[in-house]
Amino acid sequence: MKHLTSAEVRQMFLDFFKEKGHAVEPSASLVPHEDPSLLWINSGVATLKKYFDGRVVPENPRIVNAQKAIRTNDIENVGKTARHHTFFEMLGNFSIGDYFKEEAITWAWEFLTSDKWIGFDKELLSVTVHPEDEEAYEFWAKKIGIPEERIIRLEGNFWDIGEGPSGPNTEIFYDRGEAYGNDPEDPELYPGGENDRYLEVWNLVFSEFNHNPDGTYTPLPKKNIDTGMGLERMVSVIQNVPTNFDTDLFVPIIKATESISGETYGKDNVKDTAFKVIADHIRTVAFAVSDGALPSNEGRGYVLRRLLRRAVRYAKTINIHRPFMFDLVPVVAEIMADFYPEVKEKADFIAKVIKTEEERFHETLNEGLAILSEMIKKEKDKGSSVISGADVFKLYDTYGFPVELTEEYAEDENMTVDHEGFEEEMNQQRERARNARQDVGSMQVQGGALRDVTVESTFVGYSQTKADANIIVLLQDGQLIEEAHEGESVQIILDETPFYAESGGQIGDKGYLRSEQAVVRIKDVQKAPNGQHVHEGVVESGTVQKGLHVTAEVEDHMRSGVIKNHTATHLLHQALKDVLGTHVNQAGSLVTENRLRFDFSHFGQVTKEELEQIERIVNEKIWASIPVSIDLKPIAEAKEMGAMALFGEKYGDIVRVVQVGDYSLELCGGCHVRNTAEIGLFKIVSESGIGAGTRRIEAVTGQGAYVEMNSQISVLKQTADELKTNIKEVPKRVAALQAELKDAQRENESLLAKLGNVEAGAILSKVKEVDGVNVLAAKVNAKDMNHLRTMVDELKAKLGSAVIVLGAVQNDKVNISAGVTKDLIEKGLHAGKLVKQAAEVCGGGGGGRPDMAQAGGKQPEKLEEALASVEDWVKSVL
């Protein structure tokens, strides 16, 4: 057997089947396209369902692929076994009604045993077949020539997922030798049994039956082949290594993690688990983000968040206490660059997403662990071994702990979590959110008699803001009426209207309905259940009756502001993609006459320079006087043109395409300017984060932008007056003041350091000798954790050999820092373990390296007790 790299194995598989007349199907995105039944692409065949179920006929019925996949159903085993993964590659060859068992078996054997290809020793291969699949048995025994003792009949060799195509399968196993099992009494030591010696390297599924609803099986008119070979497992056999993690797909990641942690892989099972978890999870997250998924609290995003936070938890066991996963992205990208160049191309963005998520979790991790420690203690004191659903929800909602992460921490303490109670809390939160969404005035038009109103009403407001119309429906408080009088609120449906009804982020129009006998001021317009525009207003004069002929007129000033802001929103969307990356997608918007608000997907803050660039691009497009064209097109044609559609939005067969020159192309039902020059000016007012992976920009256009800029100039003039300088000199004057402030701060820190030295010197008298070891545990005055660590370092230097624990109270919170000199570390003393037990006394938690560690607590009144416990801990270790 030749030694091959993982890249060579993958390419060799594709090349082999290409020679056999197969078309190479590119690896599809991990995020399923038009398949709501799947959270992730989880197998090689998942992307080919359209061919197998007959929706699409492939140009070539023979297909081969190398497909990336994600499965997280066994996540708790990842890192603890040799071959469990959340991300993996599946190599497969497929036949859609073309060849069948004979070719599939013959080619599999050729690929595995031919010296031109893999070159396995034939004597080390065994196969399993279904007991009733005599055809496959005969092919293996007579055509291939495998001895009968190496053909095992197993009942489990039948692929069936319920109703639909099914059939027997045959699996090929490689014997790795007696080093992986040689106990003749082991009942599982056979190909297909639970053992490490005989590894399954290929599964060939013969899809020849239809599983009927009544439970019977009938032959399929066209028989298919579906095979799967796990690349990671195959490479472990070819490279002759004990686990998948020892292959060239993982080793570079593990080595990079060794460099970050200072620990060594292969010396300790607990630490090895951490290395494996990190190596597996970074591959999954990097590829998923590359394909457009982002961490969040739902769906795919929740999976990514859970994986990242699980990796952070395990990283602590190898002394990594900072964001680090993002540093591994270039390593993953390099390993996979030949076949998956997109990860390398997007490496900077992927790293940015991961770093942001890590930083967010680290901000709450220690505090969350302290809370969890309290929860565990509370339950144990009650004699309970279950963390309540309410507590699990608090950790999830406040501190970002996925329930599975809390469960893993609980397992360390021999406890479980109340999943049912947690789900109940989650459902209550969803109900609260749903009620909040529904508690809006616009929903009032959806009830009552409107459900039964089916008369037609035509919207003409794209081309005009004024129209003659008749009142065809008149309502008050949701009930049909014949007339309304001055001062009364009404809802009106016209046979024809220029008023836009709120949708797609654009607010409803305002204006007037006028006739000789009445005037109605329209305050809002919403869509009725059957699509008509419902005008909500107040009768300002006269009497309004059903059938009344009116002139409907939208406020020109209001509509003018709305259309400027709406077209500017389209320009902003494209500018965001240009500057921040193509991952940016609209997550929500609001378009009013005075301002626009645009929510978008993006990780990390948008820098000042990026905002300036975005604003400049939008203004350049405005000043370029670009025509805006609007057309109705079939949805397929619009998508082919590259029109941006809102994710999750439902569109009909014919869609409205809004195009701004060759710069922006979107599906949109809103109102727009005819030329970008009409917008005049665009000014960003604010940019902020509104949730995990979602940012918000608020901006103004036209007259609003002019007013905003004038306001900023006014503030600048006022600042210049206060600084007694002119506008141009303000930055210099501010810089000078900042320099003066820094000098004052440095002087203050110097004085604090001197005071710290004095205090450090003063507490040397508190040093005690415990079993021949200098131990110093004292409460001190320190403004923050950095100050506390500095004092510990100074005392270590002065004492030469000592265990030091200093505690301070700041803003009703406890800070503790511990230090152990090198000579005492060799005796088994560990600062991280010491500070953890001290912090627990104060209702907190923490940890760190053997020589230096820190922790926090929430009960300052127990600090003295915590410091007093240090001597006993040292004695227990020595």
From Swiss-Prot:
It is found in: Cytoplasm. It comes from the Bacteria. The lineage of its organism: Bacteria, Bacillati, Bacillota, Bacilli, Bacillales. SMART domains: tRNA_SAD (SM00863). It catalyses: tRNA(Ala) + L-alanine + ATP = L-alanyl-tRNA(Ala) + AMP + diphosphate. Consists of three domains; the N-terminal catalytic domain, the editing domain and the C-terminal C-Ala domain. The editing domain removes incorrectly charged amino acids, while the C-Ala domain, along with tRNA(Ala), serves as a bridge to cooperatively bring together the editing and aminoacylation centers thus stimulating deacylation of misacylated tRNAs. Its cofactor is Zn(2+). GO terms for cellular component: cytosol. Pfam families: DHHA1 (PF02272), tRNA-synt_2c (PF01411), tRNA_SAD (PF07973). Zn(2+) binds at residues 566, 570, 668, 672. Keywords: Aminoacyl-tRNA synthetase, ATP-binding, Cytoplasm, Ligase, Metal-binding, Nucleotide-binding, Protein biosynthesis, RNA-binding, tRNA-binding, Zinc. The keyword Nucleotide-binding applies. Binds 1 zinc ion per subunit. The keyword Membrane does not apply. GO terms for molecular function: alanine-tRNA ligase activity; aminoacyl-tRNA deacylase activity; ATP binding; catalytic activity, acting on a protein; transferase activity; tRNA binding; zinc ion binding. It comes from Bacillus subtilis (strain 168). Catalyzes the attachment of alanine to tRNA(Ala) in a two-step reaction: alanine is first activated by ATP to form Ala-AMP and then transferred to the acceptor end of tRNA(Ala). Also edits incorrectly charged Ser-tRNA(Ala) and Gly-tRNA(Ala) via its editing domain. GO terms for biological process: alanyl-tRNA aminoacylation. This is Alanine--tRNA ligase. InterPro entries: aa-tRNA-synth_II/BPL/LPL, Ala-tRNA-lgiase_IIc, Ala-tRNA-ligase_IIc_anticod-bd, Ala-tRNA-synth_IIc_core, Ala-tRNA-synth_IIc_N, Ala-tRNA_ligase, Ala_tRNA_ligase_euk/bac, DHHA1_dom. Belongs to the class-II aminoacyl-tRNA synthetase family. Its EC number is 6.1.1.7. Signal peptide: none annotated.
